[in-house]
């Protein structure tokens, strides 16, 4: 028996002891450490990734006064204390400003700066994520993931201990398998330190989505692939790997790892079952990927050059030193399954009944005779009463429908123009005919919550959860509480985004 085989068996036995002793006691990074490939970065807004970790998981900043607070686990190794966030963010909006590194290396993720591409915020920075866009439960306890709309990104260009050059590393992420698009590039992992494209092989990151510009897998996607810079790779070929399946899990575990002329993609349902290997073998046959030229920055939600058109949801993920064994990763997957990720409610406040006709009354002082209505494709507010014309009363009435993109939220169909729905486009609200596309469904899905000013409901965009129905100069937008658009002004924001829902005029 070779010494290498003995060591492998010893590690497998040790991992088995860790896993069988208590999945609750051993977090993912404890398991990686036992396997000889310790975490050098560990990020999660939902739970601690070490059994002994009690520090901050993430920081939120509220819109009302700009103050911040850290969210820690309920107990060592436990689930995030979502109640602290809910209390701190009550009656206002909150953004996730920092995702802390639990490894002790200080590899925290913060708002991504501009690079080859500018972000949509001031000075070319990317957007920060809403703190409430991705509620879940872990073992029945509420927590929040990181729901990332196009334009949202986090980064650390001065990371410590991450792989550079052709050095070995591993990584995993737990993602929402139903939240993706085809834009570049929803990534988590190793990237350039300059925010620019410095050539083939300068990245090694998990990618999730259905982009087909470079590589692809079986079916129509989405797929787990690796962003190695100037290519999303599903295997040896720079085009297609039929062994990389389309994913349909609500919660997905995505794994990428790489060492000298060897790399792998693995994946699983994060709520049940075990990991499958979608590719394991030599580096891509295209030039520049053997050896690799990794730079060691860390990105989330964007490409290495700050390409920021993608969308996705991140719950937890780590990066390791060294190439983890399949056995180690299998034990990590068992721990993720034991965390029992499950969906949580996306709505709150007064309930809206699917199939009912409603009208939405402005609550801003001086404008309370106005209701949400439309004039052709323009969604606006108009003065409406029971004595208004039939046409106007119909224009100010909306049929509540199950959310076109997410059945946990709602869509609003025009009473006087059946088949047409309120949707956002360039952050203006429009009335457009349902064209049956994924983009339209996402643009037309909204999640009501308790009104920010204490009255009625505020209606949050599902696809841009920092943004709410807001009347501004009597026209409707999806607006954020502060931002670069004129309609993002903070003045009277809570009132302008709060609506009293009543039985429809028609």
Curated annotation (Swiss-Prot):
GO cellular component: extracellular region
Species this chain originates from: Aspergillus oryzae (strain ATCC 42149 / RIB 40) (Yellow koji mold)
Catalysed reaction equations from the record: Hydrolysis of terminal non-reducing alpha-L-arabinofuranoside residues in alpha-L-arabinosides
Name by which UniProt lists this protein: Alpha-L-arabinofuranosidase B
Broad class of enzyme this protein falls into: hydrolase
Role summary: Alpha-L-arabinofuranosidase involved in the degradation of arabinoxylan, a major component of plant hemicellulose. Able to hydrolyze 1,5-, 1,3- and 1,2-alpha-linkages not only in L-arabinofuranosyl oligosaccharides, but also in polysaccharides containing terminal non-reducing L-arabinofuranoses in side chains, like L-arabinan, arabinogalactan and arabinoxylan.
The record's note on its domains: Organized into two domains: an N-terminal catalytic domain and a C-terminal arabinose-binding domain (ABD).
GO MF: alpha-L-arabinofuranosidase activity
Positions glycosylated per UniProt: 91
Temperature dependence per UniProt: Optimum temperature is 60 degrees Celsius.
Region (Catalytic) residue spans: 27-343
Family per similarity comment: Belongs to the glycosyl hydrolase 54 family.
Keyword Nucleotide-binding: no
EC number: 3.2.1.55
Pathway: Glycan metabolism; L-arabinan degradation
Region (ABD): 344-506
Catalytic residues (UniProt): 229, 305
Assigned keywords, A-Z: Carbohydrate metabolism, Disulfide bond, Glycoprotein, Glycosidase, Hydrolase, Polysaccharide degradation, Secreted, Signal, Xylan degradation
Binding residue positions for substrate: 227, 230, 304, 424, 426-427, 443, 471, 473, 476, 496
Disulfide-bond pairs as recorded: 29-39, 89-94, 184-185, 409-447
InterPro entries: A-L-arabinofuranosidase_B_cat, ABFB, AbfB_ABD, AbfB_ABD_sf, ConA-like_dom_sf
Main location: secreted
Domain of life: Eukaryota
């Amino acid at each position: 028996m070779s010494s290498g085989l003995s060591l492998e068996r010893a590690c497998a036995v040790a991992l088995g002891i860790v896993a069988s002793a208590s999945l609750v006691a051993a977090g993912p990074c404890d398991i990686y450490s036992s396997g000889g490939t310790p975490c050098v970065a560990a990020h999660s807004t939902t739970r601690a990734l070490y059994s002994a970790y009690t520090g901050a998981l993430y920081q939120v900043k509220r819109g009302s006064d700009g103050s911040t607070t850290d969210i820690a686990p309920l107990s060592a190794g436990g689930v995030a204390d979502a109640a602290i966030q809910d209390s701190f963010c009550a009656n206002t909006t909150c953004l996730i400003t920092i995702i802390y590194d639990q490894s002790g290396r200080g590899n925290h993720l913060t708002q991504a700066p501009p690079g080859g591409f500018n972000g949509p915020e001031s000075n070319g920075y990317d957007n920060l994520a809403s703190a409430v866009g991705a509620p879940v439960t872990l073992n029945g306890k509420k927590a929040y993931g990181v729901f990332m709309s196009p334009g949202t990104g986090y980064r650390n260009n001065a990371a410590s201990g991450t792989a550079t050059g052709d050095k070995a590393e591993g990584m995993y992420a737990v993602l929402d398998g139903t939240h993706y698009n085809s834009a570049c590039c929803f990534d988590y992992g190793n990237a350039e330190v300059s925010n620019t494209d410095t050539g083939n092989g300068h990245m090694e990151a998990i990618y999730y989505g259905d982009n087909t510009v470079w590589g692809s897998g079986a079916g129509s996607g989405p797929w787990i692939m690796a962003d190695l810079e100037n290519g999303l790779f599903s295997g040896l070929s720079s085009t297609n790997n039929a062994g990389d399946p389309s994913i349909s899990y609500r919660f997905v575990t995505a794994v990428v790892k790489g060492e000298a002329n060897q790399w792998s993609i693995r994946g699983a349902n994060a709520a049940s079952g075990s990991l499958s290997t979608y590719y394991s073998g030599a580096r891509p046959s295209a030039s520049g990927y053997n050896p690799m030229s990794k730079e060691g920055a860390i990105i989330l939600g964007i490409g290495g050059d700050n390409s920021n058109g993608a969308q996705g949801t991140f719950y937890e993920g780590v990066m390791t030193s060294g190439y983890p064994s399949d056995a180690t990763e299998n034990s990590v997957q068992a721990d993720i399954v034991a965390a029992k990720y499950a969906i949580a409610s996306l709505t709150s406040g007064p309930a809206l009944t699917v199939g009912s006709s409603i009208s939405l009354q402005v609550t801003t002082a001086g404008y309370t005779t106005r209701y949400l209505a439309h004039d052709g494709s323009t969604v606006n507010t108009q003065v409406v009463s029971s004595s208004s014309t039939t046409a106007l009363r119909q224009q100010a009435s909306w049929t509540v429908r199950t959310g076109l993109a997410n059945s946990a939220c709602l869509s609003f169909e025009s009473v006087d123009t059946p088949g047409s729905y309120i949707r956002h486009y360039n952050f203006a609200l429009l009335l457009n005919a349902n064209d049956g596309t994924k983009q339209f469904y996402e643009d037309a899905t909204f999640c009501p919550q308790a009104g920010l000013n204490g009255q009625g409901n505020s209606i949050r965009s599902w696809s841009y959860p920092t943004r709410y129905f807001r009347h501004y100069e009597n026209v409707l937008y999806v607006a954020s509480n502060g931002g670069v658009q004129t309609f993002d002004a903070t003045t009277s924001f809570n009132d302008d985004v709060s609506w009293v829902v009543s039985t429809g005029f028609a």
